[in-house]
């Protein structure tokens, strides 16, 4: 592993650097589901007994900052992907809390040079402290050669 | 026919092809809903001025299409995890096709893994990903 990547991992991984609360409005989760093409009533009908936000709704929630303060700028950042893990349904009409940390930092070297990837993870909890879901944002920074 | 239980899933089977609505109207409504109302998602000409080939479908909307496809195949499926890679822009108003294939079936815990791809009319992969899905044991 490159020395600067190892140092960044030591300094930044697995330390919460942001906390934010999010209201989950039912009309917004229903519209989100509709635009995605969902047809299941549990995502579209607020009267359904198992009414819930669509699983990837949390991917649309952003913390106050994507990377920790003083994180090295390896290059221009671009959105390289999203991941979601679901443990319990996110219920519309509730307020949830998201805590963000850097989950991974790694590099790949190709023909155009080195690319550094940073994975920010937001862990979402309900008011009772139950861990509902994780949302990962993968940013790729291409270094200038 | 919709899948109801894990016993109905066959390793290697293709999910029914899903044609998402990648119109500019949908992309634009979605971008505004999540607070990303910039021209790159709402206006072809504005996106071109930013150096893009046209307005894009937001990446997380593509992820939403993939999950909707799984729910069309198996309405009671619970998404346990989905990871998506945004390989290239999905341009709004261009036709795209989503395909999926079952790459693992665990009849004991009811979980399946599905590889998913969003491709344009040239057959170029724009987004790909993997989902882990929980199905009823039956």
Predicted regions and their residues:
Chain B
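Short, intrinsically disordered, mixed-charge
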Residues: 32-36, 71-75, 121
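A generic structural signal for short beta-strands and their flanking turns/coil linkers
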Residues: 18, 26, 37, 78-82, ...
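Hydrophobic beta-strand-centered segment that forms part of the acyl-chain substrate-binding groove
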Residues: 48-102
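HotDog/MaoC-like acyl-thioester-processing domains
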Residues: 1-15, 89-138
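Catalytic strand-loop segment that frames the active site of acyl-thioester-processing enzymes
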Residues: 1-55
């Amino acid at each position: 592993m490159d020395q600067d990547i190892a140092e960044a991992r030591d300094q930044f991984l697995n330390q919460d650097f942001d906390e934010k609360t999010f209201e989950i409005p039912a009309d917004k989760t229903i519209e989100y589901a509709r635009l995605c093409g969902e047809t299941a009533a549990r995502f579209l009908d607020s009267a359904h007994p198992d009414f819930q936000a669509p699983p990837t709704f949390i991917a649309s929630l952003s913390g106050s900052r994507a990377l920790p303060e003083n994180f090295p700028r390896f290059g221009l950042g671009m959105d390289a992907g999203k991941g979601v893990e679901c443990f319990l349904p996110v219920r519309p009409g509730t307020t949830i809390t998201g805590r963000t940390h850097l989950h991974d930092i790694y590099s790949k070297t190709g023909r155009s040079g080195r690319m550094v990837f940073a994975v920010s993870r937001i862990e979402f909890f309900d008011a009772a402290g139950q861990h509902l879901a994780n949302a990962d944002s993968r940013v790729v920074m291409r270094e200038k050669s | 026919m919709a899948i109801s239980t894990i016993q109905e899933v066959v390793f290697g089977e293709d999910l029914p092809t899903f044609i998402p609505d990648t119109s500019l109207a949908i992309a634009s409504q979605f971008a505004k809903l999540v607070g990303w109302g910039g021209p790159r998602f709402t206006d072809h000409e504005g996106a071109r001025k930013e150096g893009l080939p046209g307005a894009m479908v937001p990446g997380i909307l593509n992820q939403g299409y993939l999950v909707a496809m799984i729910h069309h195949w198996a309405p009671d499926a619970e998404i346990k995890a989905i990871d998506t890679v945004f390989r290239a822009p999905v341009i709004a108003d261009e036709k795209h096709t989503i395909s999926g294939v079952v790459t693992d079936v665990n009849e004991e815990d009811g979980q399946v893994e599905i590889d998913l791809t969003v491709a344009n009319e040239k057959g170029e992969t724009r987004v790909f990903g993997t989902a882990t899905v929980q199905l009823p044991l039956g």
